[in-house]
Design a protein with these regions (language model features):
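Thiol/disulfide oxidoreductase modules built on the thioredoxin-like
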Residues: 94-102
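Alpha-helical interaction elements in eukaryotic regulators
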Residues: 37, 57-60, 64, 86-90, ...
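Non-catalytic, surface beta->alpha helical segment in thiol-disulfide oxidoreductase systems
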Residues: 108-138
């Protein structure tokens, strides 16, 4: 399943942040922190041709990274969620974007591709390389 991340999410983030700035008493510091993390996640997803949210100790994350290592990807960003200061909130925001809080999560050209199982299936069907080529990641 591929989900196109649209500007609607960015618009929602901007509206939320603008509302916070206009009426700060209605929002908590936690709300602002969530918004900041959401903005950082979206910046990484949209700022790189290939983005992976991973955990260093997760076997599925390791497998997905091994799949990607077979390709000479020219713009790959790997974010090790377990090394982030607010891992729990980051996973919560990833769930808002993709419907999943688990890792790994692979994005190509701003599109959510899936986790290890989906990536393996796409590669087995011969569709991963064309996705990477369309994204100009190879």
């Amino acid at each position: 399943m591929i989900i196109r991340l649209s500007s609607a999410i960015l618009l929602l983030c901007s509206i939320t942040l603008a509302a916070y700035e206009n009426e700060p008493e209605r929002y908590t510091d936690k709300d602002l922190q969530k918004q900041i993390i959401m903005d950082e996640i979206m910046h990484e997803i949209n700022g790189h041709k290939v983005t992976v949210f991973s955990k260093t100790y997760c076997p599925y994350s390791k497998r997905l990274k091994r799949i990607l290592a077979n390709y000479d990807i020219n713009d790959l960003k790997i974010i090790e969620v377990n090394q982030e200061p607010d891992m729990k909130t980051m996973q919560e925001m990833l769930k808002t974007i993709t419907g999943r809080s688990t890792v790994p999560q692979l994005f190509i050209d701003g599109e959510f591709i899936g986790g290890h199982a989906e990536t393996r299936a796409i590669e087995d069907r011969g569709e991963l390389k064309p996705l990477l080529l369309r994204a100009r990641a190879l």
